[in-house]
Amino acid sequence: MTVLARGERATQIENGGICVTGLSQFTQPVRVVRNPADLRSEVLVVAIKGPDVRAILKSIPAEPISTALSIQNGLEKNDLLIDAFGSHRVLGALANASGEMFADGKVAFTRNAGIYIGEFDGASTGRVAQIIAAIDGSGVRAQASGQILSLEWSKFAAWAGMMVLSVTTRAATWKYLQDPSAAKLIVQLAAEVSQIAQALGVKLTDDSVLPVAAMCAGTETEAVNLVMRLGAQFEQSAPQHRMSSLQDLDAGRPLEIEPTLGYAHRVALKLGVSDPTLEACLSLTRAIDRTQR
């Protein structure tokens, strides 16, 4: 395993390996590469954040890579990988897992619902099976999916509202999920993302951190009550859970806005889908990002 890292994080990994606490406890030495041009890997897993992702991908040599996938938030990630490496090398993927990295470089593994990987055409392939086996064997739950685009959009439909509420309330996840006003905004954003996905021919499912298909199928009041009930479950099962967006805000790091909310809004504009709530939240989070750093 080789890790592409920069700055202080690269030094931490070089000196102490990858140190994980929480649901799993281990320290693993790994090879560190600081220059993307020096990376040589058969399978590339992208898990970085920041505005320079496109440039980094473009600087990674494509020839050794047979398969590339990204567990970043949002949907722009797939376009970036396809642009850099070609569609034949790219798999869909999403992470329904959580963690938090501390200043000393240690990572708290706090939620292990799973990582999903699949071919965009739904085919069952050997490369998907091999990657799933490697990840699952490491202790992180992983499984193949024949409807990966549906899962990716379903995750984003839930993530969008949770991200916005995390950086506006700065509260633990369960707290705003149980707030009726916050839950209403989450429901409204999920409905707009669902309309964008439908315009692309993608159907949402309930296989996500929030059951977005059910949220969009009933009345708004029913959906709000459902989100609030899930908030109570979060309070019991993951009381310390904080969105990575809130972690980034507290640490003074840039927020994931343009590849996530921004990308969805651009797709909505292109398709002629009305998204007033998403557009307003995009402006709000951009302002928070600019003024808090």
Over which residues does each language-model region extend?
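NAD(P)-binding Rossmann-fold cofactor-contacting core
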Residues: 1-24
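Generic preference for hydrophobic
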Residues: 3, 32-33, 117
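Active-site-adjacent beta-strand anchor residues
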Residues: 3-4, 46-47, 71, 146-147, ...
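Conserved active-site and cofactor/substrate-binding residues in soluble primary-metabolism enzymes
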Residues: 8, 51, 76, 126, ...
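Short alpha-helix immediately C-terminal to the canonical SAM-binding loop
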Residues: 10-13, 78, 265
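Internal alpha-helical scaffold of NAD(P)-dependent oxidoreductase catalytic cores
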Residues: 12, 63-64, 84-89, 108-211
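Rossmann-like NAD(P)(H) cofactor-binding subdomain of soluble oxidoreductases
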Residues: 23-108
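NAD(P)-dependent Rossmann-like dehydrogenase/reductase catalytic/cofactor-binding core
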Residues: 187, 191-293
